[in-house]
From Swiss-Prot:
Official protein name in the record: Endoglucanase B
Top EC class, one word: hydrolase
Active site, per annotation: 204 (proton donor), 363 (nucleophile)
Keyword Signal attributed: yes
Signal sequence annotation: 1-27
Record field: catalytic activity: Endohydrolysis of (1->4)-beta-D-glucosidic linkages in cellulose, lichenin and cereal beta-D-glucans
Molecular-function GO terms, alphabetical: cellulase activity
Region named Disordered: 476-495
CDD domains recorded: Dockerin_I (cd14256)
InterPro entries: Dockerin_1_rpt, Dockerin_dom, Dockerin_dom_sf, EF_Hand_1_Ca_BS, Glyco_hydro_5, Glyco_hydro_5_CS, Glycoside_hydrolase_SF
Amino acid sequence: MKKFLVLLIALIMIATLLVVPGVQTSAEGSYADLAEPDDDWLHVEGTNIVDKYGNKVWITGANWFGFNCRERMLLDSYHSDIIADIELVADKGINVVRMPIATDLLYAWSQGIYPPSTDTSYNNPALAGLNSYELFNFMLENFKRVGIKVILDVHSPETDNQGHNYPLWYNTTITEEIFKKAWVWVAERYKNDDTIIGFDLKNEPHTNTGTMKIKAQSAIWDDSNHPNNWKRVAEETALAILEVHPNVLIFVEGVEMYPKDGIWDDETFDTSPWTGNNDYYGNWWGGNLRGVKDYPINLGKYQSQLVYSPHDYGPIVYEQDWFKGDFITANDEQAKRILYEQCWRDNWAYIMEEGISPLLLGEWGGMTEGGHPLLDLNLKYLRCMRDFILENKYKLHHTFWCINIDSADTGGLFTRDEGTPFPGGRDLKWNDNKYDNYLYPVLWKTEDGKFIGLDHKIPLGRNGISISQLSNYTPSVTPSPSATPSPTTITAPPTDTVTYGDVNGDGRVNSSDVALLKRYLLGLVENINKEAADVNVSGTVNSTDLAIMKRYVLRSISELPYK
């Protein structure tokens, strides 16, 4: 804890060097508070996820990581125009982004500390001077604008590009208490913003490295009070969250190993194929939900917010036993049966098949090009999983891994290799092969090809509709669809000559105006509406105006001008 506090103090000192002199960097309040409230929350009925009116939805999304990394931002924003990237993702029909983040970053924010993110203003001028918390909310605003929802995923205890390799949700710095407090803070902070529809409590709990497993260093699933019992911690954390925010979906992943007799009575166990005793079932990290049969998550009155969430991959990520033997020569239908019988059914598919819960396949995907010796088998796996998802539409939801190019063993939907360039992409292209053959077939869309979003008012990108625009949609109260995607805004009180705060002249006052004014004060732009920017009517535009603008957008003050 001492190290952690020293680190946080250092981060405060760094952050203060990155902001406009004289401007307070308090981020209490956010654009999320200004969102359309409470019309897009989801819950579970049987093996379906439904909206507040009981209409079935299908979460068909993709992962976009970076806030879990040392850069503390959505990766690819240093390659391209991040707004153009987000708009393209929406136009391609991805209705949810699963966004990995780290516990230490959430906890820092909860303590009023806002570490810096990597500067990408050379590609994204609107991001100039934004700290990690401001940048996160800027991304939420833009996801909202194009009709994309977000599932927030704690990927690792600390911001670390390899943090997913750590097996547990706690370490010597991030305790279980901090883990829970960080999540409860997020719940309180965003409970009125349905851009974030769900929390994936912890990414891929698993065992220690090597074939000799140490129980105390590994995630287990049972009814014990052990600190490493993921079932207990997930249940307690979920209940604490739901007491504050009863509308959010809770996604609970599995573990890696599970004892064949259901009893974790070995302090160590050997999983070597040569020297081990074969007493444990193994699977992908986070993909083993066999324990649900013996020890299901019990959220009491909040049970309708629970969704179990396995992960699954192909042989390029790791050559599991089921990718050997008959799988190699099998046709696609035979291969799918092998995967189902040897992995999917008993590890997680039974949960939806027995009516326990719907599932979110939180990660799947893989390489679709290149010279890897297992590429053909990887493509066979992807076809099998794609078809299995489609066969279980509405019961099996999914978020594809991943959007950005930075995943070494899977690649991304963005690529620098063969693909289609897009405006703002600069050196990035869209991977048509991966998208067209594996993701597009399992995106939620109408019979005539319109993508279906999860927002009731904002259509999904330029090629989609809102859920309330479905022809068979049944509302209790009909939401009014928006003609074009637009951000939630606060309009400044009208005056005879000027709309104070409308620095960019678009008729609204929101965080875009704050970003533009910040760029002006940093000398990055020259032409703004200075009369509108002079929100304290002092006759000059300076950092005081920026501070007032922030307070207005964050709802600390209700009127402009502010004298």
